[in-house]
A protein has these predicted regions:
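C-terminal alpha-helical interaction appendages
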Residues: 1-61
Length: 61
C-alpha cells in the first residue's frame, strides 16, 4: 500500500513536513521498483535529507 501525508512509516514522523513529503515520494517509487519496505524507507529518508541539504527544502535550524 503506498504511503501518503496521513499514512506513512513511523520512522518519518519527526521529519520536517517538506522532507517527509519527499521521503514518501521516494519510498513509494522504490516500492514500485521492487525494493523491500524497510530498505525503501531507509534509502528514502537518506535521499530526502540529502535533497533538503542541497536546498530542496527549508531545513529548520
Amino acid at each position: 500500500m503506498p504511503w501518503d501525508e496521513t499514512y506513512y512509516p513511523r520512522s518519518m514522523r519527526n521529519l520536517p513536513p517538506e522532507v517527509r513529503r519527499k521521503a514518501i515520494e521516494i519510498a513509494n517509487a522504490l516500492l514500485e521498483e521492487g525494493y523491500e519496505e524497510g530498505k525503501a524507507i531507509r534509502i528514502a529518508i537518506a535521499k530526502a535529507r540529502e535533497w533538503a541539504a542541497r536546498g530542496g527544502a527549508v531545513w529548520p535550524r
